[in-house]
Regions:
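Hydrophobic, membrane-facing alpha-helical anchors
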Residues: 172-185, 256-260, 281-293
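N-terminal membrane-entry
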Residues: 210-230
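Hydrophobic core segments of alpha-helical transmembrane domains
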Residues: 225-233, 403-407
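Extracytoplasmic/periplasmic domains immediately adjacent to an N-terminal transmembrane anchor
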Residues: 2-211, 215, 413, 417-464
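Juxtamembrane interface at the cytosolic side of transmembrane helices
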Residues: 229-281
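Membrane-spanning alpha-helical segments of multipass transporters and channels
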Residues: 272-278, 286-444
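Helix-boundary and loop/linker segments of multi-pass membrane transporters
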Residues: 19, 258-262, 297
Length: 464
């Protein structure tokens, strides 16, 4: 099998100082780092600064149970009054609305009760007829389990829409009462009550318990799983390569190569995969133990542990494959995929419906979003498959297969083509240079010793 040929020039001691005076030496690290940080800033800030401006098909449920016409009028006005591109107003039954909320497919709902029209008529009649009555009411419910910011947007939108609807209903009711009384003047309290007749109540659907960080615990736990896979793969790859003798190990001032083990690239990658599997089993358990100790509610403990193991393995194996295939560049690619593009497209802190289209496109395949869906389903939504868990399992599995195929096939090809992990040409050249210098020093010492011996042998002969 052919051996890879050195492609590096031997080191030139005279070039040591000159090399750091070139534009390339200073420009390359600055440009690469600046580009990476610029992308980080643009992506992170671009995804969160204008959620209301970026709204698109934001789902809100409306339940009209009113037996009379007033509920339908409010519903029609609500649907017509809100931008159809920004909001997805779903007029559904009570059971369907509950399903949407339980699966995080709606951020809030408006409920119009069965007696709304009759209560509205009685309230109008009470303006001119003595007697006690109650204001007709509707209820706005937000869904923090789908997302805290999303629930806030839903509540704000429905509150503003109902303020407009309340004024319109008040105008119609005032005109109706005026027609019935022949235009007789009303008391100030009656006129004020008729102008805004609807009592808009606000509430929370299935509130989150204490210990969830106002709905952020799912996001941070998902982030921990992703970092365990990504960061773990970097640490494992570095240590394994050092222990096998293919990269130097530096501990403070100590710089050393371990005795090199004869092993192929593919076998090395298999070792890293095996360590990542073991690390995933332990890390997921440690995460759950710490979370429980800190008071985080974990309703489905072993299921969350199992999915955590699966997610860490998928991310860790894929990241290890990228590092093995691309070398040092694999670290930047992994960071780009799992962290830089992943966090703003997770749909955790800002709902995807309130982010620019680019992030919604990223969320279709980005690992962070899939892991978040799985963790949120297990922590907040009773582990329902239709609440994101099935999608999380499916796409996490796809990512795992991609990582296995990418690393396995390409490292195997590297081995077949002869791109073995032999000591680099630079190290060989340095060793040869050191050996040459050592031989030169020995030669000088031998020459000096010979001259000294010759001089000593000549001195007695001159004396005689």
């Amino acid at each position: 099998m052919s051996q890879s040929q050195p492609r590096h020039a031997a080191p030139n001691p005279k070039r040591n100082i000159k090399s750091i005076r070139t534009v390339r030496f200073w420009a390359l690290p600055v440009v690469v780092t600046l580009a990476l940080m610029s992308a980080l800033c643009a992506l992170y800030l671009g995804g969160i600064l204008n959620p209301m401006t970026n709204l698109r098909h934001f789902p809100i449920a409306v339940v009209n149970e009113d037996a009379g016409p007033s509920g339908a009028q409010i519903t029609d006005g609500l649907v017509a009054g809100l931008d159809k591109n920004k909001f997805d107003i779903r007029v559904v039954s009570h059971d369907e609305a509950q399903r949407l909320l339980d699966t995080a497919h709606a951020y809030g709902e408006l409920v119009i009760p069965p007696t709304f029209s009759s209560s509205l008529r009685e309230f109008g009649a009470s303006a001119v007829t003595p007697g006690r009555t109650t204001r007709p009411s509707v209820t706005i419910l937000t869904n923090p389990r789908a997302g805290t910011l999303g629930a806030g947007i839903a509540g704000q939108t429905l509150t503003q829409a109902m303020a407009v609807a309340n004024g319109r209903v008040g105008q119609r009711l005032t005109a109706q009462v005026a027609a019935e009384t022949g235009g007789a003047p009303l008391t100030g309290a009656s006129a004020l009550g008729l102008a805004n007749p609807i009592d808009v109540k606000a509430g929370v659907y299935n509130p989150l318990p204490n210990g969830t960080g106002n709905g952020l615990s799912a996001f941070y736990f998902a982030l921990l799983l992703l970092l365990a896979g990504f960061t773990g793969s970097v640490v494992v790859s570095t240590l394994v390569d050092a222990l096998l003798g293919y990269v130097p190990a530096e501990w403070g001032p100590v710089y050393r190569f371990a005795e090199q083990v004869k092993i192929s690239r593919f076998q090395t990658l298999q070792l890293k995969w095996a360590i990542m599997v073991l690390l995933a089993l332990l890390t997921s358990a440690v995460y759950l133990a710490i979370a429980h100790g800190l008071g985080m509610p974990i309703p489905l403990g072993w299921q969350l542990w199992a999915y955590g193991v699966f997610a860490i393995i998928a991310v860790g194996i894929t990241s290890s494959s990228l590092l093995s295939v691309l070398g040092s560049m694999g670290l930047l690619v992994s960071m780009l995929i799992f962290v830089i593009l992943g966090l703003p497209s997770a749909g955790a802190t800002v709902p995807l419906e309130a982010t620019p289209p680019f992030f919604r496109w990223l969320a279709e395949f980005e690992p962070m979003h899939q892991v978040f869906l799985g963790v949120r389903s297990l922590l907040y939504l009773n582990g329902r498959a239709d609440a994101g868990l099935s999608q999380a399992l499916w796409l996490t599995g796809v990512g795992l297969v991609i990582g296995l195929l990418l690393g396995g096939i390409i490292t195997h090809l590297y081995d077949r083509k002869g791109f073995h992990r032999i000591p680099g040409a630079v190290e060989l050249a340095i060793a040869a240079e050191h050996q040459a210098q050592h031989q030169a020093r020995l030669s000088k010492r031998e020459s000096a010793a010979e001259r000294t011996a010759d001089a000593e042998s000549e001195s007695p002969s001159e004396q005689t």
